A protein has these predicted regions:
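Acidic, low-complexity intrinsically disordered regions
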Residues: 1-284
Length: 284
């Protein structure tokens, strides 16, 4: 399970869910920078989208390894942010010309330390914070999208879709039980290679809790209710990812690990994304 090589014949899919509600106007320390939660969400999403495009580049051009969808929820509704139809193939995405900006980013260096490094960043999506938080409605839409994708004959043997939800964890259209139920439905969808992976990234303004990535159960004891609920909504990371997660967390890390992170630095958030969105086998 979770071993299928990602190729142009056996493609995979990524869904990035972005909380764009009014609560994202709050400011948060993101690594060494202060910004709004909406800016942190957009920054993280833009970094992931650019990485997905870069991973598909070969000497003969961008290979069509996966479909990508970005689902925004806020302003009292759900919207597709890359393409109105939902999915966009990565080669079509690469042909777009997003706005560029320069930003100083906390980057993990080879010696394990973090340093501020200036990067040029593509802006595929822009920060937005307005209205309520229809996370349940967004999960319903994503459930149907990934189910339809997995049902297609050409995708049935593929590495399963990966859903990454970036939020401050406060839905307005459901209670905790209902959110847990719809997330369970999303995780229950599968290809022959495994179930959909649902990762939650909790953007929090708290500066009193330690940052945690791929938490174990005992690391969630001091977390707030929203973080604990998001952890229960997340996938338990498969054994195929255990070694990479152990290397990230260090000595004392023992599975099972929840597919989430909270109160994390920029470098840690990107580590979550990198591990969660990397097949354990090479792309060919």
């Amino acid at each position: 399970m979770y071993a299928q090589e990602i190729t142009r014949r056996h493609r995979t899919a990524f869904v990035i869910m972005l909380d764009r509600s009014a609560s994202m106007q709050g400011r948060v320390r993101f690594g060494r920078m202060m910004m709004t939660k909406a800016e942190a969400v957009a920054f993280t999403a833009n970094a992931l989208i650019s990485e997905l495009v870069d991973r598909s580049r070969r000497t003969d051009g961008v290979r069509n390894y996966y479909d990508v969808a970005v689902v925004g929820y806020g302003n009292d509704g759900v919207a597709m942010l890359l393409d109105e139809a939902g999915w966009l193939s990565v080669d079509a995405l690469a042909r777009r010309e997003p706005r560029m900006s320069r930003i100083s980013v906390e980057t993990l260096m080879p010696d394990g330390t973090a340093a501020m490094v200036e990067h040029s960043r593509a802006r595929w999506v822009e920060p937005h914070a307005e209205g309520t938080t229809p996370m349940y409605e967004a999960m319903l839409r994503v459930r149907d999208m990934v189910a339809e994708w997995c049902d297609k004959m050409e995708n049935r043997e593929s590495f399963p879709p990966i859903v990454i939800n970036i939020t401050d964890g406060e839905p307005s259209d459901c209670n905790d039980r209902e959110l847990l139920d719809i997330c369970s439905q999303v995780r229950g969808i599968s290809t022959q290679d495994g179930n959909v992976l649902l990762l939650n990234i909790h953007i929090t303004a708290s500066d009193t809790l330690p940052s945690v990535v791929f938490p174990m159960a005992d690391e969630l004891i001091s977390a707030g209710r929203s973080a604990r609920v998001l952890a229960e909504c997340s996938s338990i990371m498969p054994d195929a990812f255990a070694e990479a997660i152990h290397d990230l967390k260090g000595a004392g890390a023992v599975p099972p690990y929840y597919g989430m992170g909270y109160n994390a630095t920029v470098a840690e958030l990107l580590s979550i994304i990198n591990i969660g969105s990397r097949s354990i086998t090479r792309m060919a």
